[in-house]
């Protein structure tokens, strides 16, 4: 019976009776994600593309390992003994002071309001970077056309979650089992957006079998534009909320950010063939006419003017339990 190898970067099935000392090619280190770059601590190679990261060939040879790594130990939460209500009451005389009535908040507009494209401000650094890329791509265009149809032996499939490599013409007839969604890392959990099997262990995440069947994608030309995750964060001042998306060399003519008072839809094309999508149901209300987007060579900043000067508890409006159930049913 074939067993699954849990060595990092392998994920292959093997026969335990034919497990030689050099049968497995794997990474002894750990995955490193820093400033949008992804790689392994044991290797020097870094990439911004998650599929390229998954296809980085291991740097060490050894025996296959069928032992599943233990789940990270969760901290034990200790609770104190319950105290009587009388013990929790303050020992001094209470004086209740009635606070003044708060200023009436702005009524939340309907999310069905028409969407408006936010103004795009393009920095000089981005213009210079795009001009350089156009010159270099023009010089290499002929060479790319010659090499585009050639698939080298050992080329990894570009579909997410597929660890197969090209071994010849027979590989063109194989069925590819892959993940059609994008990888999501949130609050220590790792999963694919298409099947939502969550795990806290990165090795287990890499070994998750795909949920979709189709054909292998051996070249980026066949893959077309690929939806990829981007590192992003947000901050706020008294009157503005700013979202920063760390995508290099974004293309203004193909990118779009649209919004209404409570919704934000982000679509960014960057580095020629990568796409980033994000739909945000905003916690507060914004003034669309006074909001704009600044595009630089290294990131995109979405500046939204608050409709009222108040502190937002978070960027996104929390979903209700009813909405979560409806979303799970839809998935």
From Swiss-Prot:
Q: Spell out the Basic and acidic residues composition-biased ranges.
A: 64-82
Function noted in UniProt:
Regulates centrosome duplication, probably by inhibiting the kinase activity of ROCK2. Proposed to act as co-chaperone for HSP90. May play a role in the regulation of NOD1 via a HSP90 chaperone complex. In vitro, has intrinsic chaperone activity. This function may be achieved by inhibiting association of ROCK2 with NPM1. Plays a role in ensuring the localization of the tyrosine kinase receptor EGFR to the plasma membrane, and thus ensures the subsequent regulation of EGFR activity and EGF-induced actin cytoskeleton remodeling. Involved in stress response. Prevents tumorigenesis.
- Where Zn(2+) 3 binds, per the record, is at 157, 162, 176, 216
Quaternary structure, per UniProt, is: Interacts with HSP90AA1, HSP90AB1, PPP5C, ROCK1 and ROCK2.
Phosphoserine: residues carrying this PTM: 51
Sequence positions that bind Zn(2+) 4: 179, 194-195, 211
Domain of life from the UniProt record = Eukaryota
Q: What residue ranges are annotated as transmembrane?
A: none
Phosphothreonine modified-residue sites? 47
Q: Which residues form the CHORD domain?
A: 5-64, 157-216
Per the UniProt record, the source organism is: Rattus norvegicus (Rat)
Q: Where does Zn(2+) 2 bind?
A: 27, 42-43, 59
Q: Which residues carry this modification: N-acetylalanine?
A: 2
Q: What are the leading ranks of the lineage?
A: Eukaryota, Metazoa, Chordata, Craniata, Vertebrata
Which Pfam families does this UniProt record tie to the protein? CHORD, CS
Give the start-end ranges of region Interaction with HSP90AA1 and HSP90AB1: 65-316
Spans annotated as Disordered: 62-82
Gene Ontology molecular function: any one: ADP binding
UniProt protein name: Cysteine and histidine-rich domain-containing protein 1
The annotated region (Interaction with PPP5C) lies at 2-77
The UniProt annotation places Zn(2+) 1 binding at 5, 10, 24, 64
Q: Name one GO biological process term.
A: chaperone-mediated protein folding
Record-linked InterPro entries? CHORD_dom (IPR007051), CHRD1 (IPR039790), CS_dom (IPR007052), HSP20-like_chaperone (IPR008978)
């Amino acid at each position: 019976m074939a067993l699954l190898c849990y060595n990092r970067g392998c994920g292959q099935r093997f026969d335990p009776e034919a497990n030689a000392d050099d049968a497995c090619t794997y990474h002894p280190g750990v995955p490193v994600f820093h400033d949008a770059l992804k790689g392994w601590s044991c290797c020097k190679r870094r990439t911004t593309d998650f599929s390229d990261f998954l296809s980085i060939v291991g740097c060490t040879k050894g025996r296959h390992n069928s032992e599943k790594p233990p789940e990270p130990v969760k901290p034990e939460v200790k609770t104190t003994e319950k105290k009587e209500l009388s013990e929790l009451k303050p020992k001094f005389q209470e004086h209740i002071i009635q606070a003044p009535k708060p200023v009436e908040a702005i009524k939340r507009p309907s999310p069905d309001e028409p969407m408006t494209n936010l103004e795009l401000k393009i920095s000089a650094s981005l213009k210079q970077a795009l001009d350089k890329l156009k010159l270099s791509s023009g010089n290499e265009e002929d060479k790319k056309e010659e090499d585009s149809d050639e698939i080298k032996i050992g080329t990894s499939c570009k579909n997410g979650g597929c660890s197969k490599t090209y071994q010849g013409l027979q590989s063109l007839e194989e069925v590819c089992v892959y993940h059609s969604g994008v990888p999501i890392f949130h609050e220590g959990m790792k999963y694919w957006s298409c099947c939502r099997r969550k795990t806290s262990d990165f090795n287990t995440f890499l070994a998750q079998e795909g949920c979709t069947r189709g054909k292998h994608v051996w070249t980026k030309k066949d893959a077309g534009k690929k939806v990829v995750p981007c590192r992003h964060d947000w901050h706020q001042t008294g009157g503005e909320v700013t979202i920063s998306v760390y995508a290099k060399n974004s293309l203004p003519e193909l990118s779009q950010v649209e919004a209404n008072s409570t919704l934000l839809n982000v679509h960014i094309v960057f580095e020629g063939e990568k796409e980033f999508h994000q739909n945000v149901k905003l916690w507060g209300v914004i003034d669309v006419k006074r909001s704009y987007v600044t595009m630089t060579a290294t990131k995109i900043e979405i500046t939204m003017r608050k409709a009222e000067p108040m502190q937002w508890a978070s960027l996104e409006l929390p979903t209700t339990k009813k909405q979560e159930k409806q979303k799970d049913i839809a998935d």
